[in-house]
Amino acid sequence: MKAVIMAGGEGTRLRPLSLGVPKPMTPLFGRPVMEHIITLLKRHHITDICVTLCYKPQSVMDYFGSGEQLGVQLTYFVEEEPLGTAGSVRNCLSHLGREDFLVISGDCVCDLDLTEAIQAHQEWESCATLVLYAHPKPLEYGLVLTDEQGRVQRFVEKPSWGQVVTNMVNTGIYILSPRAMELVPQQGPFDFGKDLFPTLLEQRMPLYGCPLEGYWCDMGDCGAYLKCVQDALDGRVTMDLNIPQRSDGIWSAQSLPQGITLTPPCWIDRDVELEPGAIVGPYAVISRECRVGERAVVQRSVLLEGTAVDSRASLDGAILCPGSAAQKKSILKDGAVLGDNALAEEGAILLERVRLWPGQTAPAGCRLARSITSGSQKGVHRFGDGGVIRGVLGEDLGPDALLGIGSVLGVEGQVGLGCSNTPGARMLARAGAGGGGPPPARGGGGGGRPPPPPPPGGAPPP
């Protein structure tokens, strides 16, 4: 049987991790996620593979080439514009011929028994068979309700808990027949989940769901990415981690120095520098040519190629993209991400889920509660001459900026806050007061309720 890997995704929710590469090229234990999918297909004797591409296609083709080094044959089909899942597969029909074939996403992580699904599809003589997975948190996925024979009865897209009639989610892995693809229009976008499968259901054509046991994860965002890493280190998914296991829970491509603290599980690639007193793990992934400084802490975090964590810096649940660095005494909290070549300067603190886009900087000593993206942040707000923060209303200065300023100023105690009698000033004052926490019991300022607007002709703008 032939297969189609859908690898055209941009990975918007995975940013900034996916900004430099298409989503299927996201590194996972030193290799792109899509390489793990190719290994899975080969394990089930599927070696003739089409790859559909759209976003940054050349990076995929340059890395994998013909597929010969992996023992497979890859044929690429590039979309000039997005055609939907079924539309992209339609482009491959000239290569697929008149045989049934398997479709799988290039950015999922799984070890499901694809052979079992193929056999079930053939026994049912199905037009299309959906691989299903019993998910403990089904709200983020499309649910598939089947009868006792496995025939699909209906779909429920991203339900509320009141709509959860099953925990069987659509994995995006399908076995399709030419009969099913005949319903895909020759032109324009067309989607499997929104268009093709409802049409098959409406026309009462054989449409089945095959639940499989094992591991499956949609690597949709940075949190899911870290969860996949932790599950792999825990052995919950069958995956070749590509380097030797030197002791229980410790994978390392190099000998490890004395004077460091390792808490398993950890994965450490070659050409890594671990300085004395470094604390690594649990759930730490350190890619090649990385450096972890003296008494730095890296826990539940992923360091991609060529990154640095300086002395006494602390990472807990963070991701460092290639070329980025966390300088001395900086702190990156759960969900923080440094994009390619981004920098957290000395003493900077990135709070939960704060992300720096590629090339951005968190200045020394700052405390960031919001992400910095290219074009949306001209720098951290500083008090300039005369104790004034200057900026353009709605661009440099907005409610989110004042919330952050208020959260910092209110830490030391009560702070007086006034404003001019203009709508913009009142808006910023309310945001600044809101950032300071609950109102004090007595007195004003310090994060209390916003000040009343002054009478007309009151104090001039600050």
Task: Label every model-predicted segment.
Residues 1-61:
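N-terminal glycine-rich phosphate-binding loop and ensuing alpha1 helix
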Residues 9, 34, 60, 76, ...:
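Buried hydrophobic positions in well-ordered alpha/beta secondary-structure cores of metabolic enzymes
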Residues 60-148, 183-185:
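Conserved beta-loop-beta/alpha segment of the NTase-like Rossmann-fold superfamily
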Residues 100-102, 109, 115-122, 135-138, ...:
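Catalytic-core segments of class I nucleotidyltransferases/pyrophosphorylases
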Residues 188, 202-299, 303:
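Extended, small-residue-rich solenoid/repeat segments and analogous flexible loops
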Residues 294-389, 393-394, 403:
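Glycine-rich hexapeptide-repeat left-handed beta-helix
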Residues 378-431:
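An N-terminal, well-structured beta->alpha segment
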Residues 415-435, 440-442, 455-457, 462:
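N-terminal small/polar loop signature for handling phosphorylated ligands or for N-terminal nucleophile
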